[in-house]
């Protein structure tokens, strides 16, 4: 049984939290003992965006976009209720509950330890996580909960399309409420660089390879060639970020835990909200499970990229998004176990 529960998740994915901690330590040590590296990297910027970081993020996101079959959009009418739950929770509820929960903890509960200025930047990072529903890892969570594969593909594809239109205005609105000045052009450029370009490249690559070698070759062989690229891209990105975050982490180690608290609470809340609504409207379990998972998990790669572009590599906002990476896997694996235990509740008479 244990083997089966882990069959859909790779060794790297299962221990992502461990790798994040290791990368934190490596990055902090490099930044402390080799400060010249940070100074050199500061010169490799264009329009405020770190070129090395942009390349690493493309390496991460490009393989994810290749996995999404946008032709599946034609099947959007087969599970409309499940998709409506996903869209409403992801875009009309989740960003605003993240804002509310994070604000409450950063400005009220943790005000003894977090200054108002830091709280504002941590909130900005949390908002970026809350507005970006998960893309690649949803396939893993869906597999572990025995979700409907066809529905999972459609929900991921549709949400990726919605990101193109909804991400910028929602982020702009919520950060504006927090009196965080975000240039619209910078925000739009971030989405163009880190969503539109890899998305277009992924679609084109998929079409060309499938046309030449077939779908089976693409999904069974070609995609797996990029598994290590995504892993390396994520690890190097984390090391790069923590090179600049070292002083912040060393001065405020408790803040890592404080940031994690509202992120974890939000994850559980959104999962049970979507999962519960699916139960109320009597959707089958294999639809309800992935519907809950996509809202609960975050597109943390995009959140990290936009945080760095908007606020800088050494910003508290960027730190908040990396804490999202730290908590993602253990929390989601817990939700997988909960979902599987509640499977019997979705058998209707």
Predicted segments, located by residue:
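Alpha-helical transmembrane segments of multi-pass small-molecule/ion transporters
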Residues: 1-66, 71-296, 300-349
């Amino acid at each position: 049984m244990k083997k089966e529960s882990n069959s859909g998740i790779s060794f790297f994915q299962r221990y992502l939290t461990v790798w994040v901690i290791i990368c934190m330590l490596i990055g902090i040590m490099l930044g402390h003992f080799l400060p010249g590296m940070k100074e050199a990297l500061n010169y490799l910027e264009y329009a405020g965006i770190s070129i090395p970081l942009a390349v690493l993020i493309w390496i991460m996101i490009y393989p994810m976009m290749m996995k999404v079959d946008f032709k599946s959009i034609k099947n959007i009418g087969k599970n409309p209720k499940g998709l409506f739950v996903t869209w409403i929770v992801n875009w009309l509820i989740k960003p605003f509950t993240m804002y509310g929960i994070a604000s409450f903890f950063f400005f009220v509960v943790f005000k003894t330890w977090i200054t108002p200025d830091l709280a504002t930047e941590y909130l900005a990072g949390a908002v970026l996580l809350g507005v970006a529903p998960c893309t690649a890892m949803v396939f893993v969570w869906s597999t572990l909960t025995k979700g409907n594969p066809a529905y999972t593909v459609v929900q991921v594809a549709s949400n990726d399309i919605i990101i193109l239109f909804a991400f910028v205005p929602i982020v702009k609105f919520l950060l504006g409420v927090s009196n965080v000045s975000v240039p619209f052009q910078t925000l739009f450029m971030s989405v163009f660089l880190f969503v539109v370009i890899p998305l277009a490249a992924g679609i084109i690559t998929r079409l060309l390879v499938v046309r030449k070698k077939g779908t089976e070759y693409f999904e069974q062989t070609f995609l797996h060639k990029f598994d290590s690229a995504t892993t390396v891209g994520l690890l190097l990105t984390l090391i790069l970020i923590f090179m600049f975050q070292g002083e912040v982490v060393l001065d405020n180690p408790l803040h890592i835990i404080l940031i994690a608290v509202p992120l974890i609470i939000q994850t559980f809340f959104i999962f049970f909200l979507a999962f519960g609504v699916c139960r109320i409207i009597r959707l089958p379990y294999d639809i309800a499970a992935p519907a809950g998972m996509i809202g609960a998990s975050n597109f943390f790669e995009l959140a990290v990229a936009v945080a760095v572009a908007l606020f800088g590599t050494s910003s508290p906002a960027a730190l908040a998004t990396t804490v999202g990476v730290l908590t993602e896997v253990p929390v989601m694996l817990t939700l997988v176990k909960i979902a599987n235990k509640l499977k019997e509740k979705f058998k209707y008479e």
